[in-house]
C-alpha cells in the first residue's frame, strides 16, 4: 500500500465527526507537506500561479541550507583548531556530545568529516529542540483554532536555530522558541497576522533574559573553558586594525572562517541562498537594497565624522557587511513578507531604516557592538506606519492630479 493510499484511508478518522477530529491539523500538516494540497479556489476571483505558501516556505527553508551546512562545518572547525593549538583542552571536555564525536569522527581541523560531525553534534540538537517544541505550539494553536498547521514554522525554526551560539543550553532553546512562537506570532492570530518576526522575538528574549549565554567571549565556540571574541567585539575594542591583528582578513570574514552564531558567519553562504530568494522574487530586492544603502550611507557619515575614542566610527561599510549578523538579517529576516512593509516605496524606506538603525546601534553604542536584531524589530514596529503614510501620500497625489 502506497503512502498516498494510506493517508487517504485514514483521512475520515480525522475529519469532522471522526475519532481523531481534534488532531486534523496534524494530519493535514503531514499530508500537505508530503503532497500538493487538493483544495482549490471555489469563488471568484481565480488566480493561477506556480507557487503557493507551501512551496514558498520550503524554498526559503532550502535556501538556508548553504549557511546551515557551512555553519556546522565552521563550528567544528573552530573547535578543532582550538584543540590542535591547546591539546589539554581536549582532555578536559566531557559529555555525550564528545562521546558521540569520538565514536564517529576525530578532532582534526583539516578533516571535513571531523568538522561536520563536531558541528552537527551541536547544531542538530538545537534545531531538533526548536522544531519539536515550536511544532508543539503550532499544532496546539492550530487544533484550538481548527485550522491547518502552516509550513511557515519550517522557516521560523531553522532561522531561530541559526542565530544561536553553539554553546546555548537546550532548555533555553526551548524557552526562546516558545516565547517567539506564542508571544511573537500566535497571540496575534498566527501566520500572516504577526507584526514582528517570531524568530527574532525569541532570539531577543534570550538575549535580554540570559545575556551570559547569548553574549560575551565564552559562548561562540563549543569548547568548554575557552573564550574568544567575535569580529565585531574585536572591532569595538580596537577597530579594523584589531581584527587584522588577530589574523582575521576580510576574505576570512566573508567566507565565514571565524567565531559567531552558527548560521551567521559566512556571508558567501548566505548570499548563495539569498540569490535564489531574489531570483524567485520571494525576497524583496527593494528591502535588501534599502538595507544596504542605509548601512553604506551611515557608514560613510560616521567615517567622515570620526572619533578619537570610538574606533567603530572608522570601520568601513564592507567590514560591517561581513561581521556579525548583518548579512543573515538582511537576507532572511528583513525580507519576511509578513512583518515588513508591503508597498514598493515602503519597502525602500523599511530597508533604509534597518540599515540606518543597525549602524547607530553598532557605532554609537559601544556596549552593544551588534545591532541587526534590534534594528529589524524596530523597523517591524514602524512597517505599518510607513505603509500608511505611503498610501496616504499616493491618495493625495492622485486627488491633486485628478482634481
UniProtKB/Swiss-Prot annotation:
The chain crosses the membrane at residues 56-76, 121-141, 164-184, 225-245, 260-280, 287-307, 312-332, 348-368, 371-391. HAMAP family: NqrB. One of its GO terms (biological process) is transmembrane transport. It catalyses: a ubiquinone + n Na(+)(in) + NADH + H(+) = a ubiquinol + n Na(+)(out) + NAD(+). Its main location: membrane. GO terms for molecular function: FMN binding; oxidoreductase activity, acting on NAD(P)H, quinone or similar compound as acceptor. It is found in: Cell inner membrane. It is an enzyme of class 7 (translocase). Disulfide bonds: none annotated. NQR complex catalyzes the reduction of ubiquinone-1 to ubiquinol by two successive reactions, coupled with the transport of Na(+) ions from the cytoplasm to the periplasm. NqrA to NqrE are probably involved in the second step, the conversion of ubisemiquinone to ubiquinol. It comes from Pseudomonas aeruginosa (strain ATCC 15692 / DSM 22644 / CIP 104116 / JCM 14847 / LMG 12228 / 1C / PRS 101 / PAO1). The modification FMN phosphoryl threonine is found at residue 230. This is Na(+)-translocating NADH-quinone reductase subunit B. The keyword tRNA processing does not apply. GO terms for cellular component: plasma membrane. Its cofactor is FMN. It is a multi-pass membrane protein. Belongs to the NqrB/RnfD family.
Amino acid at each position: 500500500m502506497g503512502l498516498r493510499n494510506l493517508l487517504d484511508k485514514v483521512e475520515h478518522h480525522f475529519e469532522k465527526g471522526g475519532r481523531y477530529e481534534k488532531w486534523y491539523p496534524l494530519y493535514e500538516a503531514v499530508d500537505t507537506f508530503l503532497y500538493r494540497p487538493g483544495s482549490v479556489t471555489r469563488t471568484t476571483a481565480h488566480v493561477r500561479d506556480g507557487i503557493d505558501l507551501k512551496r514558498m516556505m520550503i524554498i526559503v527553508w532550502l535556501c538556508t541550507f548553504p549557511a546551515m551546512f557551512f555553519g556546522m562545518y565552521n563550528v567544528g572547525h573552530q573547535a578543532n583548531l582550538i584543540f590542535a593549538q591547546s591539546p589539554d583542552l581536549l582532555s578536559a571536555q566531557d559529555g555525550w556530545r564528545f562521546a558521540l564525536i569520538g565514536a564517529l569522527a576525530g578532532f582534526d581541523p583539516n578533516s571535513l568529516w571531523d568538522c561536520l560531525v563536531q558541528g552537527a553534534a551541536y547544531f542538530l540538537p538545537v534545531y531538533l529542540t526548536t522544531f519539536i517544541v515550536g511544532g508543539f505550539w503550532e499544532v496546539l494553536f492550530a487544533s484550538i483554532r481548527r485550522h491547518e498547521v502552516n509550513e511557515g514554522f519550517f522557516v521560523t525554526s531553522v532561522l531561530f536555530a541559526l542565530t544561536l551560539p553553539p554553546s546555548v543550553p537546550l532548555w533555553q532553546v526551548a524557552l526562546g522558541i516558545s516565547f517567539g512562537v506564542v508571544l511573537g506570532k500566535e497571540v496575534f492570530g498566527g501566520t500572516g497576522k504577526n507584526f514582528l518576526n517570531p524568530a527574532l522575538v525569541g532570539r531577543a528574549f534570550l538575549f535580554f533574559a540570559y545575556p551570559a549565554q547569548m553574549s560575551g567571549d565564552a559562548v561562540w565556540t563549543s569548547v568548554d573553558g575557552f573564550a574568544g571574541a567575535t569580529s565585531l567585539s574585536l572591532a569595538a575594542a580596537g577597530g579594523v586594525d584589531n581584527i587584522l591583528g588577530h589574523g582575521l582578513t576580510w576574505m576570512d570574514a566573508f567566507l565565514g572562517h571565524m567565531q559567531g552564531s552558527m548560521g551567521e558567519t559566512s556571508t558567501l553562504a548566505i548570499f548563495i541562498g539569498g540569490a535564489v530568494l531574489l531570483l524567485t522574487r520571494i525576497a524583496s530586492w527593494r528591502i535588501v537594497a534599502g538595507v544596504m544603502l542605509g548601512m553604506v550611507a551611515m557608514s560613510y557619515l560616521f567615517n567622515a565624522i570620526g572619533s578619537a575614542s570610538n574606533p567603530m566610527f572608522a570601520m568601513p561599510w564592507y567590514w560591517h557587511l561581513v561581521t556579525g549578523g548583518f548579512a543573515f538579517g538582511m537576507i532572511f529576516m528583513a525580507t519576511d513578507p509578513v512583518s515588513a512593509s508591503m508597498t514598493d516605496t515602503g519597502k525602500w524606506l523599511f530597508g533604509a531604516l534597518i540599515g540606518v538603525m543597525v549602524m547607530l546601534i553598532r557605532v554609537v553604542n559601544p556596549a552593544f557592538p551588534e545591532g541587526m536584531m534590534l534594528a529589524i524589530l524596530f523597523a517591524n514596529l514602524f512597517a505599518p506606519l510607513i505603509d500608511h503614510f505611503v498610501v496616504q501620500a499616493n491618495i493625495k497625489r492622485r486627488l491633486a492630479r485628478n482634481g
